[in-house]
């Protein structure tokens, strides 16, 4: 019973990851590399869903997609919730307000 409940709780996250994987396999090869960030937006989405679950991961993914345009940012941008510290590109901790 516990195992079934655990799978049911993870199901939304797994479905969203599956949709991103489908995009990576079907559409992404035809669009070419257009993402300005590292990791790419689709890899970011998968990481966000794995680390934060379906709801927070979806919020982070939409926020990232809205920032990924020619006049937006670029560079290293790992998934992190809005009030968390995150490592700089060189691996040292860096608070969000320091950027």
Curated annotation (Swiss-Prot):
Protein name: Putative membrane protein insertion efficiency factor
Keywords per UniProt: Cell inner membrane, Cell membrane, Membrane
Protein role: Could be involved in insertion of integral membrane proteins into the membrane.
Subcellular location: Cell inner membrane
Domain of life, source organism: Bacteria
GO cellular component assignments: plasma membrane
Primary localization class, coarse: membrane
Family: Belongs to the UPF0161 family.
UniProt xrefs under InterPro entries: Membr_insert_effic_factor_YidD (IPR002696)
Organism expressing this protein natively: Salinibacter ruber (strain DSM 13855 / M31)
Membrane topology: Peripheral membrane protein
């Amino acid at each position: 019973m516990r195992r079934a409940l655990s799978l049911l709780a993870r199901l939304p996250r797994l479905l969203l990851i599956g949709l991103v994987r489908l995009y990576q396999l079907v559409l992404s090869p035809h669009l070419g590399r257009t993402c300005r960030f590292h990791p790419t937006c689709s890899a970011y989405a998968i990481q966000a869903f794995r680390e934060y679950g379906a709801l927070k991961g979806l919020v982070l993914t939409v926020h990232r997609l809205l920032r990924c345009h020619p006049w937006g940012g670029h560079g290293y941008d790992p998934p992190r919730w809005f009030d968390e510290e995150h490592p700089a590109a060189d691996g040292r901790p860096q608070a969000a307000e320091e950027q």
